Amino acid sequence: MAANDSTGTALGLQDIQSGDPRVHTNQIKVALKELSDHVRRDVEKIEDQRARALFETTAEVLDGLHNAHDHFETRSEPAWK
């Protein structure tokens, strides 16, 4: 996975020109993990129980997406083989 010419976005993601999906999935995994960690930290700051539940659910969904990208990269699921 070589570096490519790229430009950043507001989220800190690079607009990578590579056609290799692993380059893109790796970047997306990093962003999903960072966002999930951020949301989990925010849960501790919020008193509203419904909002806490929403944020916890958000983190779980982001973690699931991270895992799906990981499974794609490692070809660990039958769908990706």
Regions found by a protein language model. Give the residues of each.
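Amphipathic alpha-helical coiled-coil segments
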Residues: 62-76
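N-terminal acidic leader/helix
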Residues: 3-37
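Generic alpha-helix initiation/capping and coil-helix boundary signal
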Residues: 14, 18, 44, 51-52
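Secondary-structure edge/capping motif, primarily at the C-terminal ends of alpha-helices
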Residues: 39-50, 73-76, 80
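Short, charged, amphipathic alpha-helical segments
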Residues: 49-60
